[in-house]
């Protein structure tokens, strides 16, 4: 590992001397509000009229009655059929304004959508292969993307009138596709991981690769970051979770409780906990900072003869308001759990628009009001779910 003096100074010590000023949130709100002006200037994309807006009914399986049964069931409100020209594996919501979101697809494009009416506002091109990961900065008007083309790209969404487009930086170093990215909440530092099994740490301004975190032996599938130690958590197809010590550039804790590959991991937005889901349909809940196992739910609640080894969990999302955990499966199944108790509240099947071979749910996110859930699918569609709260 080679570390430049500048990047080493950035990462060797997470202390007050390198933290941003306390008005970071105000600055972030200012920067993101400017995106509204950016959207208002954009003409409607010619592709917008080609999106087939469909509404389907969720095929629901009633969960057993329990004390924490939801006040209202989640229902499919809208389907954006043909939202992309290939599978959609990445989604990110602007958490500051809650007004727009972005999706990335096998068609190598990134699309920006208006959340209020789900209209297409812009299409970003530059990647030459499919998009696997997206991340929106809360501190700058930047969008970061990672793709099968082994590259990371930074997009300045305020440079809409530039002849060169709004891509302002690219980061090269990965030897395979980039499947997950994450931004440090306080520093201008980007984390990326993917097929080459290495977590790479970047100074987003200088594009310097500040350090590499080694240890995983298979694809890295998720990266979560936090203000507090451990500041970086990663999951992998090798079935492990690693909590990293950035000061020492090494694994602080290795979690090996999963028996199958881990496809998704998600930190709770308000609690010092996180969850991980594997290809056997098992979801495990962990307590930070020591990584203690708090709860197990998913197929672990079923008897052995009910287990289905094909129950691959591709995506997890946590509702910031209702504390509901969503899990999306490779065969199109959906499940909603009480995050605190682990009890199953609702399950169902999302019907595929292109046959069972393309029924997978690949990515998901709740909006900041907790009233909407966005899911991305193998059949090229985006779906919006809601409740009657």
UniProtKB/Swiss-Prot annotation:
CDD domains: WD40 (cd00200). WD repeats lie at residues 83-123, 126-165, 173-212, 215-254, 257-298, 308-347, 356-389. The keyword Ribonucleoprotein does not apply. It is found in: Cytoplasm; Nucleus. GO terms for cellular component: catalytic step 2 spliceosome; cytoplasm; post-mRNA release spliceosomal complex; Prp19 complex. It comes from the Eukaryota. InterPro entries: G-protein_beta_WD-40_rep, Prp46/PLRG1-like, WD40/YVTN_repeat-like_dom_sf, WD40_repeat_CS, WD40_repeat_dom_sf, WD40_rpt. Keywords: Cytoplasm, mRNA processing, mRNA splicing, Nucleus, Repeat, Spliceosome, WD repeat. Pfam families: WD40 (PF00400). GO terms for biological process: mRNA cis splicing, via spliceosome; mRNA splicing, via spliceosome. Associated with the spliceosome. Involved in pre-mRNA splicing and required for cell cycle progression at G2/M. Belongs to the WD repeat PRL1/PRL2 family. This is Pre-mRNA-splicing factor PRP46. It comes from Candida albicans (strain SC5314 / ATCC MYA-2876). The gene is PRP46.
